[in-house]
Amino acid sequence: MVAHAATCLDGKSLAQSIERQLADHVRTFQAQWGRSPGLAVLRVGNDPASAVYVRAKEQACSRVGIQSFGAHLPATITEAALLAKITELNQDERVDGILLQLPLPPHLDPRPLLYAIHPDKDVDGLHPENLGRLVRDEPGLRSCTPAGVMQLLAAYGIDVVGRSAVVVGRSILVGKPLALMLLSANATVTIAHSRSRELASITRSAEILVTAMGQPRRITADMIRPGAVVIDVGINRIQRPDGKSSLWGDVDYEAARAVASYITPVPGGVGPMTVAMLLHNTVWSYCRRHNWQQPLLSLTSMPPAP
């Protein structure tokens, strides 16, 4: 029994709130503009985890009123054929967002494929033009997971201005764009990674600690500053002795919640927010094509999760 327990940052409930807001917008816009937003998720091959993720995204689209135009393509597809499919979707007026589900089979280099997606349909925020807009603090499509983290912090009234934020991980999917978003929000940002020396001393300096390492329970309670906000982006599938699997984060959750002030669970923290921001990006892209520039989300303060 711990004497103190951190407030749980409930990404699942917040994601549901975002979905409701987006669904209201979509109903209004469909009546005005005569069509619904469209998202195309491209899955290549038969990776089981990818199948689960794509199914979750398509189900979320259905709840909000976004049409799905995705495709499941064979693992043997050539780069030329996949580029042709992306070009087709770029030109399809029904499609407002395109997402290439990663990872790809080994013979496919994701970079030219991601770069082939039109920047205005790049709902994953990975095109160089959108990353450049992020660097320049200009409007553009933002990477879904980092954007979800920022929405989660805002919804719980966690002010990042002037606070020390450490991001553990430097991937183009999470670490780098999140560091830029925190910097844009006037946090004092440090990035740690696999080559960083004395990782524990770096993480203990953080008032806001974000982990995106892909190493189950790597961050232990003694690596966390008392009272820190801990955001666990890691999703690690661990096989149990009974043959079933569990999802673990990068943080030792039960121990860390006795030290932190706020913490995200795994699952139910950042994961649902990633999907919610994918929906947001799709609707945002759809709105831009109709010259509608108003914010889509109005986040109310989230109560502490039970």
UniProtKB/Swiss-Prot annotation:
Subunit and partners: Homodimer.
Annotated source species: Thermosynechococcus vestitus (strain NIES-2133 / IAM M-273 / BP-1)
Similarity remark: Belongs to the tetrahydrofolate dehydrogenase/cyclohydrolase family.
Enzyme Commission number(s): 1.5.1.5, 3.5.4.9
Pfam families referenced in this protein's UniProt entry, alphabetically: THF_DHG_CYH, THF_DHG_CYH_C
Function according to Swiss-Prot or TrEMBL: Catalyzes the oxidation of 5,10-methylenetetrahydrofolate to 5,10-methenyltetrahydrofolate and then the hydrolysis of 5,10-methenyltetrahydrofolate to 10-formyltetrahydrofolate.
Residues bound to NADP(+): G169, R170, S171, S194, I235
Molecular-function GO terms, alphabetical: methenyltetrahydrofolate cyclohydrolase activity; methylenetetrahydrofolate dehydrogenase (NADP+) activity
Organism lineage: Bacteria, Bacillati, Cyanobacteriota, Cyanophyceae, Acaryochloridales
Keywords tagged on the record: Amino-acid biosynthesis, Histidine biosynthesis, Hydrolase, Methionine biosynthesis, Multifunctional enzyme, NADP, One-carbon metabolism, Oxidoreductase, Purine biosynthesis
Pathway: One-carbon metabolism; tetrahydrofolate interconversion
PANTHER family xrefs: C-1-TETRAHYDROFOLATE SYNTHASE, CYTOPLASMIC (PTHR48099:SF5), C-1-TETRAHYDROFOLATE SYNTHASE, CYTOPLASMIC-RELATED (PTHR48099)
Entry GO CC: cytosol
Catalytic activity: (6R)-5,10-methylene-5,6,7,8-tetrahydrofolate + NADP(+) = (6R)-5,10-methenyltetrahydrofolate + NADPH; (6R)-5,10-methenyltetrahydrofolate + H2O = (6R)-10-formyltetrahydrofolate + H(+)
GO process annotations (BP): L-histidine biosynthetic process; methionine biosynthetic process; purine nucleotide biosynthetic process; tetrahydrofolate interconversion
Name recorded for this polypeptide: Bifunctional protein FolD
PROSITE patterns: THF_DHG_CYH_2
CDD domains the record matches: NAD_bind_m-THF_DH_Cyclohyd
